[in-house]
Swiss-Prot record:
Single GO molecular function: carbohydrate derivative binding
Sequence ranges assigned to domain SIS in this UniProt record: 287-427, 460-601
Quaternary assembly: Homodimer.
InterPro entries reported in the protein's UniProt record: GATase_2_dom, GFAT, GFAT_N, GlmS/AgaS_SIS, GlmS/FrlB_SIS, Ntn_hydrolases_N, SIS_dom, SIS_dom_sf
EC number, as in UniProt: 2.6.1.16
SUPFAM superfamilies xref list: N-terminal nucleophile aminohydrolases (Ntn hydrolases), SIS domain
Protein name: Glutamine--fructose-6-phosphate aminotransferase [isomerizing]
Species the sequence originates in: Pseudomonas putida (strain ATCC 47054 / DSM 6125 / CFBP 8728 / NCIMB 11950 / KT2440)
UniProt record, GO biological process: carbohydrate metabolic process; fructose 6-phosphate metabolic process; protein N-linked glycosylation; UDP-N-acetylglucosamine metabolic process
Record-level GO cellular component terms: cytosol
NCBIfam families: glmS, PRK00331.1
Function: Catalyzes the first step in hexosamine metabolism, converting fructose-6P into glucosamine-6P using glutamine as a nitrogen source.
Broad enzyme group: transferase
Main location: cytoplasm
Length: 611
């Protein structure tokens, strides 16, 4: 959600800023802009609505060059997506700022600054920041010190970068609730909201922590913590190749990432399985001691990660015998929570920077939970740093806004957690762990077999091309998978989709079913299959068209208004992981047929770093 890039160097940095913004396009945005301090000491700005490519054209048509600059992609919160609301924002033509987050007291500050003679040209909360700093510079002329003073008056979340024409030797930044990372070079340094933006110029990074303020010069980086103490943050070298930011032979990042799932699941399992058991130490050196005390689990997440948590509830209770609650992070953080004794708090996030999930974790630390575990795809994220234990999903960078490989690796990680807890507590049935460990080893192969259904699913997608509504059904642990399928379809094809437990059809959803509303269901060959078949007959009796992803041994066949796609057999416990694949493919091909922007769907952002 929004992207920041900044640079201070001995060379022209305009192309670096634009390339950085391109690498942040996956986060979702509606406008883009940059500001550069030119050789004649003047701050110049270019802003455009739409894609970064349009900003690039504007810069080519009216070039600007300099060695200090900031750039931004905006996802509208305060103020419509217009060029006037796009960042950077100026004050006095000599101070420029870019900002991610939400300033909650912006109206109060706006009125105060208007009283001081400042004229506002946008509807954004960000413009308040730049005028406030401009005013502060009148009494505190050093840019870094002025920033330190000004942020004390800001309430809310922010990651911001600031430059001044009067102090051309530095870029300054502040972080509170919105991530920022410094990229370290030789005679040049950089800033971004995501290290992926800077991978073309460096592989060494320094992550700002909550409350940090940074002064970034060509040959020096200085950081102060929220108490005002000068601190040194760890330098991390990133070794993964840059091919993650390349679609390769695939038409879209989403399709590429769907097809990467066998390999990333294999990577997530490597080094975490013994001969016939899960290696508990994979969760951290204190995991065994902490897991032995666990009597309950509380899972908190958002979006796709929430669906992964819902699947895990079925596993934890049926396999490990541990009561589990799952809650949306934005709800958990604002309600009065009664914490059961010896409850493990589990947070799930692809980015590790999701604002509501982070806030829920921080709230949980005050509520008396036994300990915290983060299941996350980014090892240097805030969520990981602030949790007691961690299990990384190892999915690699995910560029498509609609999550695919992050979801399946989250599910794999949650199964590892289920088996580890059951192992330590002695609550698994005899032979279950060894059996499921063997099935996990076969899982990458099974996922590859599911991907071989690609052409079949592409053909079925034609049924949805002219539809406006779709119903997804599932039973047991497949209900959250149906929810994930519905989310994917609505995210990228813009078809309204809802998911229900199949047993709830008679309690309302059946009223919606007709020959213009396809019904999608997943049907593994388990004890609920016959119940599910009865539910599907109810759909057919009302003229509903069925698309059924069924186990190859389920005995289901095509018929009038019924399209059965056979799915490779897999152990029932792992079926939620496997059945995710065809639902992802279905959503993808429907979106392609409808001509939507698959990788960057409208109004959505990859990493939601504000409430």
């Amino acid at each position: 959600m929004c992207g920041i890039v900044g640079a201070v160097a001995e060379r022209n940095i305009t192309a670096i800023l634009i390339e950085g913004l391109k690498r942040l396009e996956y986060r979702g945005y509606d406008s883009a802009g940059l500001a550069v301090l030119t050789q004649n000491g003047e701050l110049q700005r270019r802003r455009r609505i739409g894609k970064v490519s349009e900003l690039e054209v504007a810069v080519a048509d009216d070039p600007l060059a300099g060695q200090l600059g900031i750039a931004h992609t905006r996802w509208a919160t305060h103020g419509a997506p217009t060029e006037g609301n796009a960042h950077p924002h100026f004050s006095g033509n000599d101070v420029a700022v870019v900002h991610n987050g939400i300033i909650e007291n912006h109206e109060e500050l706006r009125e105060e600054l208007k009283g001081l003679g400042y004229v506002f040209t946008s509807q954004t909360d960000t413009e308040v920041i730049v005028h406030l700093i401009h005013h502060t510079l009148k009494s505190i002329p050093d840019l870094t010190d002025a920033l330190k003073a000004a942020v004390k008056r800001l309430h809310g979340a922010y990651g911001l970068a600031l430059i001044s024409a009067k102090q051309p030797d530095r870029l300054v930044a502040a972080r509170s609730g919105s991530p920022l990372v410094i990229g370290l070079g030789l005679g040049e340094n950089f800033l971004a909201s995501d290290q992926l933006a800077l991978r073309q110029v460096t592989d060494r990074f320094m992550y700002l922590e909550e409350g940090d303020i940074a002064e970034i010069r060509r040959d020096q980086v200085s950081i102060w913590d929220q108490q005002g103490n000068k601190v040194q943050r760890e330098t991390v070298q990133y070794h993964e190749g840059a091919e993650a930011a390349d679609k390769g032979a695939y038409r879209h990042f989403m399709l590429k990432e769907i097809h990467e799932q066998p390999s990333v699941v294999q990577r997530t399992l490597e080094g975490r399985l013994g001969k016939d058991n899960v290696l508990v130490q994979a969760f951290g050196p204190q995991a065994a001691d902490l897991f032995a005390k666990v009597r309950n689990v509380q899972i908190v997440a958002c979006g796709t990660s929430y669906h992964a948590g819902m699947v895990a509830r079925y596993w934890l209770e049926s396999l490990a015998g541990i009561p589990c609650q799952v809650e949306v992070a934005s709800e958990f953080r604002y309600r009065k929570v009664v914490v059961q004794p010896d409850t493990l708090f589990v947070s799930i996030s692809q980015s590790g920077e999701t604002a509501d999930t982070l806030a829920a974790l921080r709230n949980a630390k005050e509520l008396g939970f036994l300990g915290s575990l983060a299941i996350c795809n980014v090892g240097i994220s805030s969520l990981v740093r602030e949790s007691d234990l961690t299990l990384l999903t190892l999915a690699g960078p995910e560029i498509g806004v609609a999550s695919t490989k992050a979801f399946t690796t989250q599910l794999v990680s949650l199964m590892l957690l289920t088996l580890a807890l059951g192992q330590v507590r002695g609550t698994l049935e005899a032979g279950v762990e060894a059996e499921l460990v063997e099935e996990l080893r076969r899982l990458p192969t099974r996922l590859g077999e599911a991907l071989a259904m690609d052409a079949t699913v592409e053909k079925i997608a034609e049924l949805f091309a002219d539809k406006h509504h779709t119903l997804f059904l599932g039973r047991g642990a497949q209900y959250p998978v149906a929810m994930e399928g519905a989310l994917k379809l609505k995210e990228i094809s813009y078809i309204h989709a809802e998911a229900y437990p199949a047993g709830e059809l008679k309690h309302g959803p059946l009223a919606l079913v007709d020959n213009d509303m396809p019904v999608v269901t997943v049907a593994p060959n388990n004890e609920l299959l016959e119940k599910l078949k009865s539910n599907l007959q109810e759909v057919r009796a009302r003229g509903g068209e069925l698309v059924v992803f069924a186990d190859e041994h389920a005995g289901m066949t095509n018929g009038e208004g019924t399209h059965v796609i056979k799915v490779p057999h897999i152990a029932d416990a792992l079926a939620p992981i496997l059945y995710t694949i065809p639902l992802q493919l279905l959503s993808y091909y429907v979106a392609v047929l409808k001509g939507t922007d698959v990788d960057q769907p409208r109004n959505l952002a990859k990493s939601v770093t504000v409430e």
